[in-house]
Amino acid sequence: MWGLKVLLLPVVSFALYPEEILDTHWELWKKTHRKQYNNKVDEISRRLIWEKNLKYISIHNLEASLGVHTYELAMNHLGDMTSEEVVQKMTGLKVPLSHSRSNDTLYIPEWEGRAPDSVDYRKKGYVTPVKNQGQCGSCWAFSSVGALEGQLKKKTGKLLNLSPQNLVDCVSENDGCGGGYMTNAFQYVQKNRGIDSEDAYPYVGQEESCMYNPTGKAAKCRGYREIPEGNEKALKRAVARVGPVSVAIDASLTSFQFYSKGVYYDESCNSDNLNHAVLAVGYGIQKGNKHWIIKNSWGENWGNKGYILMARNKNNACGIANLASFPKM
């Protein structure tokens, strides 16, 4: 029994006290990401989470160098948060309990001809810069706005930043920073006969009173279409033929939180646990691994300048084709 206690001591001490050898790195990370804490106890608590995440990243990248993984991780501005906190504060997908696809909104792909092997709407000028939703559950608004921006570019030739704040404040069927769903946003824009530009209705990262002003209207919508559930082939056709598509994924894993580069595939990703809305802006293949090009709304410091390549045709990894939709313009 005495020997067991001795063996457990290093583990317990690591859990209770920061590693002194990491002091300089911790201070550098805090300075880089402008982190401040309420008190010493709060900082130590966050430091221990950061150290745990740093260890996870290091072990993963060692495994990646040995060919175990197809992607790498890196420390970022979310380093002092647990994956549970990230889901709670920085996602926000909320699917209506009564949600069901109708034939009126179902996307029926045109299967004639072959879809391109790769598509990247960033290169075509359909995609605005990466945004940061902050600690507001407004991912659904950024995903919806991204799909609307793509269709606006396709129809008018103009690329404009549309207003996620307009959706956060005004879509009564959703819950603002408490979460929402993309098709509710498209329906709002249709019924409202428009959505303001970002310049006219800037993002503030919290829910406020609806201040939509028709003079700031930059786009409108005449409905939406939903991809057949779980059908990645149909999603590929939609991305190729229509443009950027709003999609929902499981973003609850630590591996997603610290993604850096490569094609993301984690067997633990749960296609039935959809909690985050993002935007599919293309697809392709890297080193033999098929992928979706996904735009996130966690800022450019996350992922590969705000983007992630997610595994494609791997049994609907992370549920990416389960709740996909796009607006009609």
UniProtKB/Swiss-Prot annotation:
Its EC number is 3.4.22.38. Residues 1-15 form the signal peptide. It is a peripheral membrane protein. One of its GO terms (biological process) is proteolysis. One of its GO terms (cellular component) is extracellular region. The active site is at 139, 276, 296. CDD domains: Peptidase_C1A. The keyword Transit peptide does not apply. InterPro entries: Papain-like_cys_pep_sf (IPR038765), Pept_asp_AS (IPR025661), Pept_cys_AS (IPR000169), Pept_his_AS (IPR025660), Peptidase_C1A (IPR013128), Peptidase_C1A_C (IPR000668), Peptidase_C1A_papain-like (IPR039417), Prot_inhib_I29 (IPR013201). It comes from the Eukaryota. The keyword Secreted applies. GO terms for molecular function: collagen binding; cysteine-type endopeptidase activity; cysteine-type peptidase activity; fibronectin binding; proteoglycan binding; serine-type endopeptidase activity. Predominantly expressed in osteoclasts (bones). Expressed in thyroid epithelial cells. Coiled coil: none annotated. Keywords: Cell membrane, Disease variant, Disulfide bond, Glycoprotein, Hydrolase, Lysosome, Membrane, Protease, Secreted, Signal, Thiol protease, Zymogen. Its main location: other. It is found in: Lysosome; Secreted; Apical cell membrane. PROSITE patterns: THIOL_PROTEASE_ASN, THIOL_PROTEASE_CYS, THIOL_PROTEASE_HIS. Residues 16-114 form a propeptide. It catalyses: Broad proteolytic activity. With small-molecule substrates and inhibitors, the major determinant of specificity is P2, which is preferably Leu, Met > Phe, and not Arg. It is linked to Pycnodysostosis: A rare autosomal recessive bone disorder characterized by deformity of the skull, maxilla and phalanges, osteosclerosis, and fragility of bone. Belongs to the peptidase C1 family. Thiol protease involved in osteoclastic bone resorption and may participate partially in the disorder of bone remodeling. Displays potent endoprotease activity against fibrinogen at acid pH. May play an important role in extracellular matrix degradation. Involved in the release of thyroid hormone thyroxine (T4) by limited proteolysis of TG/thyroglobulin in the thyroid follicle lumen. This is Cathepsin K. It comes from Homo sapiens (Human). The lineage of its organism: Eukaryota, Metazoa, Chordata, Craniata, Vertebrata.
